[in-house]
Amino acid sequence: MLAEFGEHGRLYAGGTELLLAMKHDLLRYEHLIDVKTIPDLNKIDMKNGTLVIGSTATHRAIERSSIVKQNLPVLAEMETHVANIRVRACGTLGGNLGFAEPHSDPATLLTALGAKVTVQGKSAMRSIAVDKLIMGAYETSLAGDELLANVEIPLPAKSQRAAYLKFQLKERPTLGLALVLDLDGDAITKALAVIGSVSAVPTQSDKANALLIGTRSQVEKQLGAAAEALARAADPIDDLEGSAEYKRHLIAVFLRRAFIKALS
């Protein structure tokens, strides 16, 4: 049906973003294709060390899932604070990623966790890393005939620690920061910090990640420089959620907080 309707049709699941945009005449479609009743698209399961979440699983279902809580608590915690209770009850993970709203939580954390999505086209299926899926504000790399089927998240190794923190004044985050650290005793051997909501797409910085490697005491002294590198890479913008200058300040504050939380 999606291929048949082309640009006049749009997939519909929770509708928390899409219907609001249509209500305000920001988007217009002649056909909405309801995917909520497609079998298995709302399942949450573990497969060979990978957490697999169907695209129509709601934020609330993910938040409450015992599988998610036991295997990836950082994701369950993040979902607990997505938007408001109405959005969590109706909004879906696949819809969130597919709409590519810049002020959103999931893509930032999923990028740091190395997640990928499986998409089904008219004649073929393919896999896309989340950091390659989000191309810009409200823009993805999905083809016109593709359905986002599920999200696959590799579980962190026992030596890894992950944290996600955000700052928001309204219902959308001004900033979201995800941090994943690989530990060997007191040393951090690998680090990945991803900043979201301050600009169009979740962003990381090789320089910032390099500054987050070393002993805990060494890295603590380098957090300021790492935050500056991350801010330069993200290039925050002025918008309704805050000024670029304010967001740069928040990056420094929340990188330090995420570092402490990941190691606690």
What positions do the PLM features span?
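C-terminal structural segment of proteins
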Residues: 1-264
